[in-house]
């Protein structure tokens, strides 16, 4: 068992003990850079302001929650990784109009799929494994990404996720999709 997996198991165990005592650990992080992607356009701000709600697929830990709250938007967050999902729930605890859901989105319901947990804080976890070709590509070259663990998850279509959770899709007209290569399959399932 690798050191990272042992750390995850220990962290999970400690959190469970605290929860049994009625306590909750909240991780304080350095806030992200104001905008690592460059200048925000007025057009983007207007779209965020004018939308009814936000559907964020590939939530990770929900670092954008404060921004969405600032706009006063209701948000549905979807994250596949069960390890990251618990932290997502904790991070969204104070945002009552933001709902976290755990699902591996695809174009078929209830299909058992391999889901690879990556290093890089789990941010690149995916149904696709890193190959040497991917690691040498322009996007990933020199980053040393790798998958640490493979788990089995059942897939769910976006339509099924909406039905199971009584979500009206038209209430969420601003979509952010970052599913590490599963974007097209997810859209086919909607």
Task: Annotate each language-model stretch with its function.
Residues 2-190:
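Phosphate/nucleotide-binding beta-alpha loop and adjacent structural elements of enzyme active sites
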């Amino acid at each position: 068992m690798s050191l990272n997996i042992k750390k995850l198991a220990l962290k999970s165990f400690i959190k469970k003990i605290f929860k049994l005592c009625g306590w909750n650990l909240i991780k304080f992080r350095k806030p992200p850079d104001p905008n690592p992607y460059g200048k925000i356009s007025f057009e983007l701000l207007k779209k965020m302001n004018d939308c009814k709600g936000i559907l964020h697929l590939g939530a990770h830990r929900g670092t954008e929650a404060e921004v969405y709250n600032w706009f006063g938007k209701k948000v549905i967050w979807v994250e596949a990784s069960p390890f990251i999902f618990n932290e997502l729930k904790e991070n969204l605890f104070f945002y009552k109009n933001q709902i976290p859901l755990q699902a591996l989105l695809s174009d078929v319901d209830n299909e058992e799929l391999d889901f690879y947990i990556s290093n890089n804080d789990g941010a690149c976890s995916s149904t696709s494994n890193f190959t040497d070709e991917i690691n040498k590509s322009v996007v990933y070259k020199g980053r040393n990404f790798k998958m640490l663990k493979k788990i089995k998850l059942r897939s769910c279509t976006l339509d099924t996720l909406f039905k199971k959770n009584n979500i009206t899709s038209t209430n969420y007209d601003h979509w952010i999709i970052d599913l590490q290569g599963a974007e097209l399959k997810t859209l086919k399932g909607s």
